[in-house]
Amino acid sequence: MRNKERNFPNQNNNKFEGEPRAKAEYASKRANGTTNTHPQERMHASGKRDDNF
């Protein structure tokens, strides 16, 4: 039996509905397939976001 069927609470406050958290500005690849520049700065900025759910 899965947790969902047993009515377990959402313990980590995970968000399962709505828009995905991944944003194009933090992606490693651009829409045209080229590699995005400055990966260290991009990853640092991604970790500092306020929408942590």
From Swiss-Prot:
<dbReference type="GO" id="GO:0042601">
    <property type="term" value="C:endospore-forming forespore"/>
</dbReference>
<keyword id="KW-0749">Sporulation</keyword>
<feature type="region of interest" description="Disordered">
    <location>
        <begin position="1"/>
        <end position="53"/>
    </location>
</feature>
<feature type="compositionally biased region" description="Basic and acidic residues">
    <location>
        <begin position="16"/>
        <end position="28"/>
    </location>
</feature>
<feature type="compositionally biased region" description="Basic and acidic residues">
    <location>
        <begin position="39"/>
        <end position="53"/>
    </location>
</feature>
<dbReference type="Pfam" id="PF08176">
    <property type="entry name" value="SspK"/>
</dbReference>
<dbReference type="GO" id="GO:0030435">
    <property type="term" value="P:sporulation resulting in formation of a cellular spore"/>
</dbReference>
<protein>
    <recommendedName>
        <fullName>Small, acid-soluble spore protein K</fullName>
    </recommendedName>
</protein>
<dbReference type="InterPro" id="IPR012611">
    <property type="entry name" value="SASP_SspK"/>
</dbReference>
<dbReference type="GO" id="GO:0030436">
    <property type="term" value="P:asexual sporulation"/>
</dbReference>
<comment type="similarity">
    <text>Belongs to the SspK family.</text>
</comment>
